[in-house]
Amino acid sequence: MAAGPAPTGVYNVRDYGAKGDGKTLDSPAINAAIEAAVANGGGQVLLPAGTYLSGSIRMKSNVDLHITAGAKILAANPKKVKSADGTSVYDESESFGGFPEYQDGGHTYFHNSLIWAEGQTNISITGHGMIDGEGLTKKDTEKAGQVQGGSIGTGDKAIALKLCRQVTIRDITIYRGGHFGIIMTGCDLSTIDNVTIDTNRDGFDIDCCKYMTITNCKINTPSDDALVLKSSYALKKAVVTEHIAISNCNITGFKCGTMLDGTYIPEPVGWVCGRFKLGTESNGGYRNIALTNCTFMYSSGLAFEEVDQGKMENIVVSNITMSHVHHYPIYITTGCRNRGPKEVTEPSSARDIQISNVIADDCDSLCSIIVTGMPDVPIHNVWLSNIRLYFKGGGTRELVNKEYREQGTNYPEPKFAGWTPAYGLYARHVRGLHISDVTFRYERPDYRPAVVLDDVGDVTIHALDAPTEAGVEQVVTLSSETVPVIYD
C-alpha cells in the first residue's frame, strides 16, 4: 500500500491505495487515510468520484469523511468478500459486559457496522455522495444481546456512533442502511442536516442523546421507523434523551428505493411504518423534544411511547402535514413493559405534551387519535389544537362498546389492539385533556362517536367540528365526568 502524501489537511484515499472501482476492497486504504489524518491532528479524508467497496471504516476524532458527488461507499457482502488475511471485512461485535437483555442487539453492539466510532469528538461525514449498504444485513441478528453464530462477521448498520461529541452528518445519501441507517447513542452536541435515506429498516435512531438538531432530511422507511428517539439501557444505565429539535423533514413509506429513483411506489396497507416515534426503548425517558414543519406521506404518523419506567415530558409538535396515513395519525401511550433493571420500581409516566397545527388526509379508519395512560398512573396535560383529520370511515356501532385493551405489558402498537371505539379521538386514563379548534371528517359512513373519553378528568373541548351519523353521540364519556363542548 502506498505511503501517502505529506500532510496537507486533505487526505485523498486514492493516495493510500484505494481504487474506487467497486471491485477492490478499499476500506483498508480509507482507514489508512483516517489514521494519517489523526497522526497530523486531523483533517479531511476525501473520497473522489468512484465506488469504494468497503468493510468497517473506523472514524476518529477531528476527521471529516467527505464523500464527494459521484462517490459511493458500497458495503461489501461478507459472504463474497474477505480481508487479505481471510477474516471478515467487518469488525467483530465488541464485548458489552452490561445488561444486553434490556435492549435489542442493534442497540448493544456498534463495531460490526460499515462506519463506526466510539468515544470520539469532532467527527463529520459530509459530501453529496452515497453510502450503499448492499452487503449489510437488515436483521437484528443479536437478539437479547447474544452474539449468535449467524451474526459473526456481518455488518448490520450503515453508521453507528457511540459516546461521541460534536458529530455532524450532512448532505449524504444512504441507500439500504441495514438494520439501522444511522444510530447515535450517547452522542451530544450533534447535527444531522440535509441527509437523504431510503432503506428497509430504521432510518435514524437517536438514543440517549442531548442537544441535537435534525433538519432538512428526507427519510423513506416502508418497513420500520423513519426517525425514532430512544432512551435505552445501552449505556448500562438509564439516560434521558433531551433537548432534541427536529424540523423541515419529509417522512415517507414508499417501496424501498423508489424515493431515490423518483417513482414513489406506495407500499400496500399493512406493516408500513415510516413514522416519527419516541420509544419503545425508554428507560431514561424523554424531555424537551420539538418537532416542527414536517411532512408525512404513505406512512404512519406520530407515536409517543413510554413503557420502560422513564418519564416523557415537555414534548411540542407543530405544523405537520400528513397524507395517506397508515394505522394512526397520533398515538400517545404509557405502559409497563419494564424492560430494565428489576430494582427500578417507578412506573412510566407522561405529561405536558402539546400538538398543534396538524392536517392529515386519507387516514386509516382502524385508529383514531389515541391517548392512553395506565389506571394508576394517568397521562397528565395533553393539548390538541388546530387539528384537521380526514378519515376513510367504515366503523360500526358495536365498536363503541368494544373493550379496548389496556396497554399493560403489551408491545405498544395500536394495530394489535384493533379498531378504536371512536373514529376521531379515544382517550383513557388521562388528567388534563384540552381540545381546541379540532375538525374530524370521514369519507364513508362511520357509526362510532367522534370522541370517546374513558376515565378522563379535567377536560376542555372548545370548537370541536366532528359530524356523526344519526343517533350517534358526538362525545361519549365512560367513567369520566360529563364534558361540555363549547362552540363558537
Question: What are these regions, as identified by a protein language model?
Answer:
Residues 1-488:
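Extracellular/periplasmic carbohydrate-active domains that bind, remodel
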